[in-house]
Amino acid sequence: MKKNEQKVVFLDRDGVINKEVGYLHHIKDFKFIDGVFSACQYFQKNGYFIIIVTNQSGIARGYYQEEDFHVLTKWMVKEFSNNSIDILDVFFCPHGPESTCNCRKPNPGMLLDAKEKYNIDMNNSWMIGDKEADVGAANSAGINNTILVKTGHNIDESHSQAKFILKSIKETIGIIK
């Protein structure tokens, strides 16, 4: 690690932090996945900052407004705070799958923006997601420590580039050190 570089656990949102419900934008539909708070407390105790990186194509598709996303995000970050967890930042891509933007995973834009903003040591950071796009974005950004969790989308384990495939985020305790 270079001087003043931070190590980070990057988390996808839907399917990692909360149960996947498809275009989530109402607080009433948000259900935290069991073990997410204890895992995040563990990451912090081990010197990691936590950043959320999430594709939100529901904005581009017109299913909800960007303001709806911000209201839900503010509430979610407060819930983390109520559990003694500091979320350093939340990066999101509002574009649809057909977009040529660099921020939509599997492109690395959100991770690279975070690296620049917070001087992150990508070699000692981790990405936890529920889709191969999360792994692709991480690898393209120089993060080789990747975990896919089975609490979101189905994972083709035989073709995955993830370093670990686990049942849920709570199984990351002990793996991330």
Summary of predicted features, one role per range:
Residues D86-D89, M122-S125, N145:
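Short acidic capping loops at alpha-helix termini that bridge into adjacent secondary structure
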Residues I17-D34, I59-D68, N83-I85, H95-N102:
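Metal-dependent phosphoesterase signature
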Residues G62-V77, C101-D113:
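Short, electropositive alpha-helical surface patch
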Residues V36, C40-T73, D86-G96, A138:
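Substrate-recognition element of Asp-dependent hydrolases with the DxDx(T/V) motif
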Residues N102-E132:
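Conserved Lys-Pro-Asp/Glu-containing loop-to-beta segment of HAD-superfamily phosphomonoesterases
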Residues M1-F49:
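Active-site neighborhood of HAD-like aspartate-dependent phosphohydrolases
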Residues M127-F164:
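Acidic, Mg2+-coordinating phosphoryl-transfer loop and its flanking beta/alpha structural elements
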Residues K163-E171:
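Short acidic-hydrophobic, aromatic-tinged amphipathic segments that line or gate anion-handling sites
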